[in-house]
């Protein structure tokens, strides 16, 4: 008796033209995630995952490289327009937005969504070096 051959369907990449770029920039690292309007992740990259280690992760150049890597993966989905949501106090905020703009992604809006406490938790004590 002949074995039945199962044909697998090839996964079709969906086309997303409008996306949201979430840039989280801390003092130690920068995370860039590009999602569709519903929040489903299309691509992401970090400055640590881009080959930077230690104090070099927190530089603006590392954030630029991470944003370029995330943009390259998002361009495969057909992304053209990007709303940018920036969160955190880090140094890679501006350079990541510029890198997205340089990759032919039209930045339609830039919004700062850094959470600000209405005097909630007590902050950590100040460093004495």
UniProtKB/Swiss-Prot annotation:
Database matches in Pfam families: Ribosomal_S11 (PF00411)
A Gene Ontology term for the protein's cellular component: ribosome
InterPro entries: Ribosomal_uS11, Ribosomal_uS11_bac-type, Ribosomal_uS11_CS, Ribosomal_uS11_sf
GO BP term, pick one: translation
Keyword terms: Ribonucleoprotein, Ribosomal protein, RNA-binding, rRNA-binding
Molecular functions (GO terms): rRNA binding; structural constituent of ribosome
HAMAP family: Ribosomal_uS11 (MF_01310)
Primary role: Located on the platform of the 30S subunit, it bridges several disparate RNA helices of the 16S rRNA. Forms part of the Shine-Dalgarno cleft in the 70S ribosome.
Assembly and interaction partners: Part of the 30S ribosomal subunit. Interacts with proteins S7 and S18. Binds to IF-3.
Family: Belongs to the universal ribosomal protein uS11 family.
This protein's name: Small ribosomal subunit protein uS11
Record organism: Francisella tularensis subsp. tularensis (strain SCHU S4 / Schu 4)
Gene name for this UniProt entry: rpsK
């Amino acid at each position: 008796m002949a074995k039945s051959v199962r044909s697998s369907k090839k996964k079709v990449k969906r086309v997303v033209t409008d996306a949201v770029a979430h840039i989280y920039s801390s003092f130690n690292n920068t995370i860039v995630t590009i999602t569709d309007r519903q929040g489903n992740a299309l691509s992401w990259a970090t400055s640590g995952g881009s080959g930077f280690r230690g104090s070099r992760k927190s530089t603006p150049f590392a954030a630029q490289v991470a944003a370029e890597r995330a943009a390259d993966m998002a361009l495969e989905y057909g992304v053209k327009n990007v709303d940018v949501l920036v969160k955190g106090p880090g140094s890679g905020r501006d350079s990541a937005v510029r890198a997205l703009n340089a990759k032919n992604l039209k930045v339609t809006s830039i919004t700062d969504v850094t959470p600000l406490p209405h005097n909630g938790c007590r902050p950590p004590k100040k460093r004495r070096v």
